[in-house]
Amino acid sequence: MLRSFLCRSQNASRNLAVTRISKKKTQTTHSLTSLSRFSYLESSGNASVRNIRFFSTSPPTEENPVSLPADEIPISSAAELTLEESVASALGFSESGDYGGTSVEAVGEDGDSEIVAIENEVYQFDDEKLESVLSLLRSDEESLEFGLNALNVDLHLDFVVRVFESPGISGKNLIRFLKWATQNEEITVTTSLVESLLVAIASDTRRMDAYGLWDLVKEIGEKESCGVLNLEILNELIALFGKLGKSKAAFDVFSKTEEFGFTPNAKTYYLTLEALCKRSFMDWACSVCEKMLKSGVLSEGEQMGNIITWFCKEGKAEEAYSVYELAKTKEKSLPPRFVATLITALCKNDGTITFAQEMLGDLSGEARRRGIKPFSDVIHSLCRMRNVKDAKALLLDMISKGPAPGNAVFNLVVHACSKTGDLDEAKEVLKLMESRGLKPDVYTYTVIISGYAKGGMMDEAQEILAEAKKKHKKLSPVTYHALIRGYCKIEEYDEALKLLNEMDRFGVQPNADEYNKLIQSFCLKALDWEKAEVLFEEMKQKGLHLNAISQGLIRAVKEMESEAKVTEDGNLLAEA
């Protein structure tokens, strides 16, 4: 678009002008036929009134004028036509309508006209003055206007355009030059000048120049029916402020669009939202989005996806979903990756998970086969909400229609079933997983074991542990930790101690937590400080540290038992 601005500005500078040269032509008289011919050429648009001027005098009075109807006007003879062509050729006219840069204004009365004088104006640049102006504009001269006045330039619109096309001039100086030039009544601000100015400032990306241009545009726009601005200029100004990171200025331009008599289009909304969202001005962005939705104007494909992504990143998933709904209404296609992004954003909030579920139905074909992430996100959210029923239903739908669920998706459902205490359902999902050729990992078994251990169902937990030992040579510390806590909860400390001793055989090194849990259980519940002290010695040998609280418990239980024994011995002696 900026290239088209520049081309239009270059086309405007084809007629070069500064020095005027006047020439006088010989006085000539033409017939009605010749006059009508000039008039036709003038009306065809090839003639320009400002270059050649014809001045007519009163024709000689005929003694017996004959008035003929229009349809009976005699046609000139061949000789007359030949004479006319030679005269036209002498004046620089040709049959093709090429006047050599001149134009005609013909005036005639009663079918006869005398051409008294022809003034041919040819405009040429004074290259020295042009270079002087450019040199001044490329400098940092503070008194720029004074310097321009001193050059005594014969201003013309083409001269101004030529200055704007010249490289190396700052946007600030171009604006100052334009304001100085428009003090001349013959120079007015045109669309091409504003476009050229926008091109120059956009290439430099200087913040203050951009603000200066906006002030000029506002001044132009506030003049009613000026016809200089257009929507594309405002759009590019919004883009410029967005590039500079000046979101407030971009929003100001957007707010003035309708005031200047233009209706925002899809590009206007897109550029404004881009400028606002990238700087997290989300309140303004939401108001622009709301206006866009009401207008029904929406970008295509990638741009629409970008708008959705910007809102999702800023936590505005509902606004993004509104854009998606409008796109569906207008049957606009959205690239699948943007659909997945929106589904993921909707899954973060329990209140919008329903929208995410509905959007899964919009994925089809290749997009659905590759859509494991959005499906997994929805199942994860349903499990977080403990909506196991819908989570399992979606899992079965994935098995039936795709995308094929992996271990991670099955684990989500198993975990949700275990947390809700529905361990039988968890085992069913585990069997379903195995039936599809998937090997449950240690985490899957651990989740079910933990569920059984929390419920005190240690026999069932041991069954799952035995199954896990068959499938995996190395288990997880979390697996044993859950079992040890389960046995301690039902006060079967010897079973817990057995598990601690077998951990090494399955590639698991007991950590301080397991020892600490058992030591505290032996001290507080079993009051067996001797076993607690044995475990403490094992920890020392393995280089593990027992916290001070547990060490204090061992000493306290040991002292308490000693005091109890002394008291008991004293009582026995007293009885004796």
From Swiss-Prot:
It is found in: Mitochondrion. Its main location: mitochondrion. Residues 1-76 form a transit peptide. The keyword Ribonucleoprotein applies. The keyword DNA repair does not apply. PPR repeats lie at residues 230-264, 265-299, 300-336, 341-370, 371-405, 406-440, 441-475, 476-510, 511-546. Pfam families: PPR (PF01535), PPR_2 (PF13041). InterPro entries: Pentatricopeptide_rpt, TPR-like_helical_dom_sf. One of its GO terms (molecular function) is mRNA binding. One of its GO terms (cellular component) is mitochondrion. Keywords: Mitochondrion, Repeat, Ribonucleoprotein, Ribosomal protein, Transit peptide. Component of the mitochondrial ribosome small subunit. Belongs to the PPR family. P subfamily. This is Small ribosomal subunit protein mS80 (rPPR6).
